[in-house]
């Protein structure tokens, strides 16, 4: 028999000599225990509560193999410069998770444990997704290479623009702004994340006018153009209806808000997009609710990894230079996690584990939010070729109008890429490069 009552988690779930398996999902949590709670107990509590544990011993424990299924806290280190804060490393056996379900992965790992009384705060800093698990996901519908081939655009970042004012335009005027931007030289325009189907502009009207704008600009420029048609909706069925209508119009790309829409809806949409040749642009509305606090919540690099598994071809990833916060090294860390195949552990960039994606397609990071032409050299240098640079106000705020704003962005981008290819230092000579480029303008 066994003794009933509350028992210490660390007896079962703190296993400092555990050797992690290649199939384990590893998590790094930033734990802030309540005063008087030892670090080992707090770390073990996280492992228990996010896997097999409950607060007492139960009869049915005897009917399962805890050793096979329990999460284990296998290492704890104090955070330098913080009082009473620790990084707890937890290993989860692969069998705890449903295959191909980001939803289930998050329900298990971060579902319950964040409200835990013994912890003052808890933050999931990073996850190591083993190939045995990542291989059960489709991942991005197309990925970076397939997208470049579809668009026939190589050797430079892609340019986008969010149509502003984000709410209040009629469908026809909205389409007009789309046309002007694409005609001026942008590759993409974008529905704002809040634009779904409101009284002033229903989704079907918007889709039709945007498609018309797209084809007109395409015919006049001889380039392939796209507009991210936001398919986010109140129900999964309605979302699919919008995506299907977009495909019937023959447009190249649709868009989804993956956090507000939810991972289940997002994964369904990603599967549809791969089956039907649509690219999928992902907006991260609501991410700051989850990732902004330094000691509670989830770091965006975890949300980014989850999106690569669930599926998306573009995702917003901060700018390093614009109006929204994001530290340079950390941002570059998760940008690499999105694009690359194999990413080495590097604590200076916030990467706690080596991540091997084993040929899962990559996601293009999107820089968006308060950036404009003068940021172009910095952006080209920071993000490199495989990115989408999005200027909303930075295009539509041009004193001469939308099309000249688009021209300005395209000229600046081409100038920066050319200068970089000639070996010039964008960080030092950036402003000079932009000035040279605009010296041909009448103003």
Curated annotation (Swiss-Prot):
This is Ribulose bisphosphate carboxylase large chain. RuBisCO catalyzes two reactions: the carboxylation of D-ribulose 1,5-bisphosphate, the primary event in carbon dioxide fixation, as well as the oxidative fragmentation of the pentose substrate in the photorespiration process. Both reactions occur simultaneously and in competition at the same active site. The active site is at residues 164, 283. Its EC number is 4.1.1.39. One of its GO terms (biological process) is photorespiration. The basic functional RuBisCO is composed of a large chain homodimer in a 'head-to-tail' conformation. In form I RuBisCO this homodimer is arranged in a barrel-like tetramer with the small subunits forming a tetrameric 'cap' on each end of the 'barrel'. The gene is rbcL. InterPro entries: RuBisCO (IPR033966), RuBisCo_large_chain_AS (IPR020878), RuBisCO_lsu_C (IPR000685), RuBisCO_lsu_C_sf (IPR036376), RuBisCO_lsu_fd_N (IPR017443), RuBisCO_lsu_N_sf (IPR036422), RuBisCO_lsuI (IPR020888). It is an enzyme of class 4 (lyase).
